[in-house]
UniProtKB/Swiss-Prot annotation:
Belongs to the carbohydrate kinase PfkB family. Its EC number is 2.7.1.56. The gene is fruK. It catalyses: beta-D-fructose 1-phosphate + ATP = beta-D-fructose 1,6-bisphosphate + ADP + H(+). It is an enzyme of class 2 (transferase). It comes from Mycoplasma genitalium (strain ATCC 33530 / DSM 19775 / NCTC 10195 / G37). This is Putative 1-phosphofructokinase.
C-alpha cells in the first residue's frame, strides 16, 4: 500500500518547527566537558533525513541575540532553513548529563507576533504543493498551531504531526493526518486516559482512528505502529552505551518517514527506525551522515 499521496521526485519535504533551539550539554561526570548542538524537533528530524539522502526545508522562527549562534552551529549540516522573526531569543535548552541520565531544563517558547505568524502562513500557502510532505513538530502556542493546521490540511494530504498538545484531537477538526507520533506520556494526555498495563494501552491504540498511521514511542520498551488495521510492536534495541536520550524519538520519526517515502514496508521501516533511534542514544545530538548504522533485527510481533 502507498501511504504517501502523489509523492514524486519533485515533491518537497517541509518541516514546520515553531521553536528551534540551541542544546547546551553539560557532563556533570566530567565538569569541564560542555557542548553546544543545534536542536529542536524539526532540526533533529532534518539532520537525520539529510543523512539519508533527502533535502528537507525547516521553516521556523529565530530571534537575536542567539539567532546567529544557532545558524553557525547548524551550518555544518547543510540544511535548508527559512526563518521568520521571533521577538525573543532563539531558545537555549540545558541538558545535564550524569550516570546515563539526562536532566532537561528547557527554555521558554519564543514570542511570535501575529504579523510574523502571518508571514509564515503566507510562505506555506505560496510554496506547499499537494504532493509535498509537511511535518509539523516541536513546541507551538495553541493559537499558532491551530492556524498552521487549518492551512496545511488544505494544501496537502501528506501531513505528519509530532506536537505535545493536550487538545490536539479538537484541533484536528475531522482532518486526518498521515502520521501522528506521540510518546507514551503525550498519548495518555491527548486521549485523557492513563494505562496501568500493556493490555489497556493496546486497547486504547486500537481505538485511535484520528490518523492513518499512529507511531507511538514507549521509551526503552520499544515502539508501536497502528495502521488502522494491524498493530505492530517492535522492541527497543539496547544501545552500545547511553549518552543522552534527547532526539531518539525525532530519529525514530525521521527514519520511519524516509523509508515510507522509499515505499519500504511498514515493519521494515519501523525496525530500521528503531536501530537509528538506538544509535542516537549512544551520542550527543542525533545520528548524521558521519555515523555508520548497522541494522539488527529486534523482537517484533503483531498484537
Amino acid at each position: 500500500m502507498t501511504w504517501l499521496q502523489n509523492i514524486t521526485k519533485e515533491s518537497k519535504i517541509w518541516i514546520v518547527n515553531y521553536a528551534c533551539a540551541i542544546d547546551y550539554y553539560v557532563d556533570l561526570n566530567k565538569q569541564k566537558n560542555s557542548v553546544l548542538i543545534p536542536g529542536g524537533k524539526g532540526i533533529n528530524v532534518a539532520i537525520v533525513m539529510k543523512s539519508l539522502g533527502f533535502d528537507p526545508t525547516v521553516i521556523t522562527f529565530l530571534g537575536q541575540p542567539t539567532k546567529n549562534l544557532f545558524l553557525e552551529l547548524v551550518k555544518p549540516y547543510d540544511l535548508n532553513i527559512v526563518s521568520f522573526i521571533s521577538e525573543t531569543k532563539t531558545r537555549i535548552n540545558l541538558k545535564l548529563l550524569k550516570d546515563e541520565k539526562t536532566t532537561e531544563i528547557n527554555d521558554l517558547s519564543p514570542l511570535i507576533t501575529d504579523a510574523n505568524l502571518t508571514e509564515l502562513l503566507t510562505f506555506l500557502k505560496a510554496n506547499v504543493k499537494n504532493n509535498d510532505l509537511v511535518i509539523i513538530n516541536g513546541r507551538f502556542k495553541f493559537e499558532a498551531l491551530e492556524k498552521v493546521l487549518n492551512l496545511v490540511f488544505t494544501l496537502t494530504e501528506n501531513v505528519v504531526i509530532d506536537v505535545d498538545e493536550s487538545k490536539m484531537l479538537t484541533l484536528l477538526n475531522q482532518s486526518k493526518p498521515l502520521v501522528m507520533k506521540p510518546n507514551i506520556d503525550e498519548f495518555q494526555t491527548m486521549i485523557n486516559t492513563f494505562f496501568h498495563d500493556q493490555q489497556s494501552l493496546i486497547a486504547a491504540i486500537k481505538k485511535f482512528h484520528y490518523c492513518k498511521l499512529l507511531l507511538l514511542s514507549d521509551g526503552d520498551k520499544g515502539a508501536y505502529l497502528f495502521d488502522q488495521n494491524k498493530l505492530l510492536f517492535v522492541s527497543s534495541i539496547t544501545p552500545k552505551q547511553v549518552v543522552s536520550t534527547t532526539g531518539a524519538g525525532d530519529t525514530l520519526l525521521a527514519v520511519f518517514l524516509a523509508n515510507l517515502i522509499l515505499k519500504v514496508d511498514l515493519k521494515t521501516a519501523l525496525i530500521k527506525a528503531t536501530n537509528y533511534a538506538s544509535a542516537t542514544i549512544s551520542k550527543l545530538g542525533v545520528v548524521d551522515s558521519k555515523d555508520k548504522i548497522s541494522v539488527i533485527t529486534p523482537k517484533s510481533y503483531y498484537l
